[in-house]
């Protein structure tokens, strides 16, 4: 997630709420939600493919930014990370280099928008995030293409 999201470590109540959301999304049937570092400021919510776990971080909470990713609720954020895990289980290996990492992020947000228990506002934010990620991919791919031609 982006730095325009929350950076303050989560309280025990917020962590418990996220654990309940994870169960609601049926994430516990896919992989473990690791909460041990979520109380640390600046911690990141992310799927770790090597360990097949989602780490809960401070940035699971929305921030003050105007971008859809900044405004995503805990449900949308966790659904996005769960979709990375589900896609990994389907055999989709995540790219780590630009520009393709942007497409992976777009696909994860679109996939997450179809998960059960994701409401309309969250769905819109996830779709808007996917659009933004595709635009970032287009810019990065064009830059890479221009560099290769030089």
Task: Outline where the language-model segments fall.
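Long, well-structured alpha-helical subdomains associated
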Residues: 101, 113-150
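Second-shell loop/turn segments in exported
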Residues: 6-11, 65-68, 97-99
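Active-site catalytic microenvironments for nucleophilic, acid-base chemistry
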Residues: 85, 89, 111-118
């Amino acid at each position: 997630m982006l730095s325009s999201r929350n950076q303050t470590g989560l309280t025990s109540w917020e962590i418990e709420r996220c654990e309940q959301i994870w169960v609601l999304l049926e994430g516990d049937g896919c992989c473990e939600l690791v909460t041990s570092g979520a109380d640390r400021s600046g911690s990141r919510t992310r799927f770790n493919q090597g360990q097949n776990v989602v780490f809960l971080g401070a940035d699971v909470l929305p921030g003050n930014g105007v971008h859809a990713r900044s405004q995503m609720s805990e449900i949308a954020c966790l659904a996005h990370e769960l979709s990375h895990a589900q896609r990994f289980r389907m055999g989709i290996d995540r790219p780590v280099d630009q520009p393709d990492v942007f497409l992976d992020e777009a696909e994860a947000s679109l996939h997450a928008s179809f998960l059960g228990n994701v409401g309309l506002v969250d769905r819109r934010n996830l779709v808007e995030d996917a659009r933004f990620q595709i635009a970032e991919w287009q810019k990065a791919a064009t830059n890479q293409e221009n560099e290769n031609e030089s």
